[in-house]
Amino acid sequence: NKNIENALKDFKEPMGVTIKMGGAQEEQEETSAFLGLALAISFLLILIILVIQFNSIGKPLIILSEILFSIIGVLLGITIFHMEMSVVMMGIGIVALAGIVVRNGILLVEFADLMMEQGMSAYEAILEAGRTRMTPVLLTATATMLGLVPLAVGLNLDFAALLSTGNPHIYFGGDNVAFWGPLSWTMIFGLSFATFLTLIVVPSMYLIRAKVKARLFDEKPVEIPED
């Protein structure tokens, strides 16, 4: 395809003749454009809901940064393990991740806000939020990833044979792994990377936001203990 595209660049088209790439490449380009639009729409809808929920633009942007983390995680996972991925299933996985990974950020930010309402400083609040919400965040992400592992590796189990003969005929691979594998690995890579960064980057961004807000509105500065 690349050779054809390079040849077409130097080819002078006759009057009234239009040349374009068709077939699988055309379908892939249309699918990629659709998935990009779907991701943008989901991003916008999540942003609107979060702005209404938190009555702020800074906190939703902190939470939505996890979508970027998940995409980076997907690309890193594919690169490190040298996997060949379906563009369609990888795109669907990223769109699905957009609605999953933000939950961890919501848990941290919402709990930190609750602690600040009770009189804690921004530093104490986000520290307590990280300490209190770390277990739920890790358990939820781990359970989700473990649930995707059978799809990712193509685990097959014959329940009918298990009930009748006691032999489940367990094997790995098959036709279904070509369909579900890319989707599952996309979500596993993205969720694991985003969850790890949630517990590090989100609290840092929350404190930076609190510092900037204190300077802009002449509020009490955010104090961070040296120890």
Task: Identify the meaning behind each predicted range.
Residues I208-I224:
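Membrane-proximal cytoplasmic C-terminal regulatory module of class A 7TM GPCRs
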